Amino acid sequence: MASLNKDKASSFSMNKVFKVGLIGCGHIAETYFRGHQYFNNFKIIACADINQKAADKCAKLYNIKSKTVNELLNDKEIDAILNLTIPQSHYSVSKRVLNSGKHVYSEKPLATYFEKGKELVALAKKRNFILAMHQTLF
């Protein structure tokens, strides 16, 4: 993980509740909503999906805002994005998130090609954002 500059490091106080946007409102999103209730340091506040009806349904079910992907990426209130898209989209979505100025947590795999994964790591390091992917959810 890249070292964080003072501005970004200050956003990681122990008392901060991170506001998170979710991209990809399929079945795995349900797992994140169920699991996130056990944590007090982040709150999912909005969702987006290429299928706007799926985003609207998810937003209504979990009482959050439904947005387009562009709206989510441009939302200054959101600190980080959960990338829950299909594996073939992980690279492109994570790249857009990093370029929009947000931290990103991606479902596995980080990318479908090793070189694309290395590119994301380099971009996160260059932009000084956290890029995370983990096999175990909670």
Where are these regions (language model features)?
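N-terminal Rossmann-like dinucleotide-binding module
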Residues: 2-62
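Short, well-ordered coil/turn segments that N-cap beta-strands
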Residues: 42, 102, 129-130
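Beta-loop-alpha module in the N-terminal Rossmann-like domain of NAD(P)-dependent dehydrogenases
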Residues: 64-123
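Short beta->alpha linker loops
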Residues: 50, 115, 137-138
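General small-molecule cofactor/ligand-binding pocket signal
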Residues: 45, 65-67, 132
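Rossmann-fold dehydrogenase core element
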Residues: 119-136
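Short, Asp-centered acidic motifs that coordinate Mg2+ and/or phosphate
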Residues: 46, 57, 79-80, 130
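Rossmann-like NAD(P)(H) cofactor-binding subdomain of soluble oxidoreductases
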Residues: 89, 109, 132-138
